[in-house]
């Protein structure tokens, strides 16, 4: 039986678009002991803000590059790219302790690990691919995972939304030869 531990102690998330409706637990996790990068600061109450958090940019704001601006006016200006200016960088992030998450499992820090019953490779696709489907066996699942394609995000250099081959939806994190990486997955099964 395969057991797993979580080698991380928290969540690293993209801030823009995260709100109480889109991801309540992620937002709740950021309420204390959290590091934010490249978000806007609401100078009136010393809180953070990003696009998609709510529809009310702070009037007294410091945008992600450090300029003090009226957030409502700033976000209504169309930039050189033909889009409204952003108070937060499109790839702004938060890092929050997992213990802050309202739904964290009591087994989260079990030193013996927890039994694995499924592995999900989470690529980003706006269309044409089912959100979830099940493989026939470990080898088939490894093959399917290796064939995942994802659309680029603000985290990647270049245009956003471009489809690229993204093995196991882990391309930015595969630190060695991808063939060896795939062989490792096959060997584990």
Please state what every model-predicted region is.
Residues 1:
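Glycine-rich phosphate-binding P-loop
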């Amino acid at each position: 039986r395969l057991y797993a531990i979580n080698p991380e102690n928290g969540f690293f998330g993209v801030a823009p678009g995260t709100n109480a409706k889109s991801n309540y637990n992620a937002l709740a996790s950021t309420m204390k002991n959290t590091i934010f990068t490249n978000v806007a600061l609401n100078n009136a109450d010393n809180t953070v803000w990003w696009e998609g958090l709510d529809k009310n940019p702070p009037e007294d704001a410091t945008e992600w590059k450090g300029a003090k601006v009226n957030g409502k006016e700033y976000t209504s200006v169309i930039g050189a790219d033909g889009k409204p200016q952003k108070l937060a960088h499109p790839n702004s992030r938060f890092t929050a302790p997992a213990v802050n998450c309202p739904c964290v499992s009591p087994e989260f820090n079990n030193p013996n690990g927890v039994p694995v019953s499924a592995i999900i490779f989470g690529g980003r696709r706006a269309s044409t691919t089912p959100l979830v489907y099940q493989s026939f066996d470990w080898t088939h699942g490894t093959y399917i995972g290796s064939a995942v394609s994802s659309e680029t995000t603000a985290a990647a250099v270049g245009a956003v939304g471009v489809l690229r081959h993204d093995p196991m939806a882990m391309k930015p994190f595969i630190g060695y030869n991808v063939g060896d990486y795939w062989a490792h997955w096959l060997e584990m099964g």
